[in-house]
């Protein structure tokens, strides 16, 4: 029998931590605490309000982090239901593909047809040859297995099975497409993947790309009218959950030290107060645990292999106002890292609104573009596109998309971490265990509670 009275420490109040707490409550666990070092919950779901409109007297949310969802966001839908948020009535998405000079990019008919043909081919291969590829998380993939939540089912049914072809998912996505003779389909995935900071296809294992943008989801991104947005911002989803929890997150509280004993865990907060727990669930970057936790040799070995993306967003006002979001495919290459890839124009028909720019600064094996250089380049790119910046409202430099290399993925990194779940009274959640978007993160956190509590 599970001990539902045990005291559980949840580190982090982002989508993972909120989902863990919500599902613990649903299973009858009432003795938990969430610690969040920021003054808000939601993590990279951050939706500050800014003034806009003809008289600059309308206050509306902008999105500095997570922007959108789609019809298979079932874990997010559970969070909406629990916390009272809704994507109904969110601002409609729209976009244009542009040259770096600000002219609309037109693809030839033959190029479009070839792209769609290869997309159809890849979709069929994913359904048959790579059955199980879209199962949440990475448990067993390096061994040719799948084991986790099936994201195409509203109940997020947990499935398990074997498929030796899944080992291919460890290779970089560009190699995966080439091996399957589907290179022409790459732009379909590049728009929602690279432009939003998740890296370049020659460096990122195919598993990350395809578990986030499975065959159904990537087609939803092709038809922007089907995408979800939130009038009150993605942050409102997790604020809603937090408000409805029996024990909302304790804000402005950083976990600064962890000591794991044989029968308890001592958690030090803000460098002074110490609390005692039976278990901890880490819902923040695992590699940061090495700085404050009493890491085992295995934790040190595995978590030191995690890499992340250097990615920042800026809310800027331009003259003139654009009327839609712009995507710059020419800047979505390793050689153009540090350039503007996309900006998000959130509110159709509303003038004087800031747009949010998205810029990626690093690539595996290459020198990082310094932050200040990338900032200047991004502003220059807007001017080049005919939208000079008149004011910068805010900048958020994110610790983004923790993941492992193709080599470490193929070497079974995930199975080694999964084998540590529950040892030393410790459980590992957070985005690295699935993917760096709110749905994959929430799905994994949900399933972790089902599996272990």
List each model region and its residues.
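N-terminal Rossmann-like FAD-binding beta1-loop-alpha1 element of flavoenzymes
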Residues: 6-33
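Conserved Rossmann-like nucleotide-cofactor binding loop
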Residues: 16, 40, 287
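Helical element adjacent to the flavin cofactor pocket in flavoenzyme catalytic cores
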Residues: 212-264
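Mid-domain catalytic core of redox enzymes
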Residues: 27, 256-369
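Conserved FAD-binding subdomain of flavin-dependent enzymes
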Residues: 40, 44-47, 53-90
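Glycine-rich FAD pyrophosphate-binding loop
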Residues: 25-51
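Conserved flavin/dinucleotide-binding core of flavoenzymes
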Residues: 345-453
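Mobile amphipathic helical/loop "lid" adjacent to a hydrophobic cofactor/ligand pocket
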Residues: 76, 80-82, 86-203
């Amino acid at each position: 029998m599970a001990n539902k009275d045990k005291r559980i420490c949840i580190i982090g109040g982002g989508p993972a931590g909120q989902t863990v707490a919500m599902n613990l409550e649903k299973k009858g666990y009432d003795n938990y605490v969430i610690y969040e070092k920021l003054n808000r919950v939601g993590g990279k779901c951050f939706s500050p309000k800014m003034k806009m409109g003809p008289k600059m007297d309308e206050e509306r949310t902008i999105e500095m982090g997570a922007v959108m969802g789609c019809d298979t966001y079932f874990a997010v839908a559970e969070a909406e239901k629990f916390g009272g948020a809704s994507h109904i009535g969110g601002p409609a998405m729209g976009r244009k593909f542009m040259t770096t000079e600000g002219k609309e990019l037109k693809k030839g008919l033959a190029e479009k047809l070839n792209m769609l043909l290869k997309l159809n081919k890849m979709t069929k291969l994913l359904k048959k040859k790579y059955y199980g590829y879209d199962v949440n998380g990475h448990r067993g993939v390096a061994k040719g297995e799948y084991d986790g939540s099936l994201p195409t089912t509203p109940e997020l049914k947990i499935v398990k099975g074997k498929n030796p072809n899944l080992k291919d998912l460890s290779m970089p996505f560009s190699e995966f497409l080439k091996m399957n003779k589907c290179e022409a389909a790459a732009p379909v995935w590049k728009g929602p993947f690279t432009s939003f900071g998740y890296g370049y296809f020659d460096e990122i294992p195919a598993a990350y790309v395809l578990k986030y943008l499975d065959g159904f989801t990537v087609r939803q991104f092709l038809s922007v009218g089907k995408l979800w947005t939130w009038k009150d911002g993605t942050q409102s989803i997790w604020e809603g959950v937090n408000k409805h929890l029996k024990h909302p997150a304790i804000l402005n509280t950083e976990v600064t030290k962890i000591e794991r004993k044989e029968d308890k865990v001592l958690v030090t907060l803000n460098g002074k107060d110490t609390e005692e727990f039976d278990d901890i669930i880490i819902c923040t970057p695992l590699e940061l645990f090495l700085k404050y936790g009493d890491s085992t040799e295995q934790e040190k070995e595995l978590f030191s292999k995690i890499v992340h993306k250097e990615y920042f967003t800026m809310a800027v006002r331009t003259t003139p106002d654009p009327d839609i979001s712009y995507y710059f495919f020419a800047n979505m290459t390793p050689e153009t890292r540090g350039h503007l890839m996309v900006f998000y124009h959130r509110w159709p028909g509303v003038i004087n609104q800031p747009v949010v720019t998205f810029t990626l600064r690093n690539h595996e094996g290459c020198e990082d573009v310094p932050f200040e250089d990338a900032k200047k380049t991004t502003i220059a790119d807007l001017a080049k596109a005919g939208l000079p910046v008149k004011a910068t409202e805010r900048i958020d430099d994110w610790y983004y998309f923790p993941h492992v290399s193709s080599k470490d993925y193929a070497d079974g990194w995930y199975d080694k971490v999964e084998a540590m779940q529950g040892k030393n009274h410790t459980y590992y959640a957070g985005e690295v265990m699935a993917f760096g978007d709110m749905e994959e993160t929430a799905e994994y956190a949900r399933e972790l509670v089902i599996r272990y509590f």
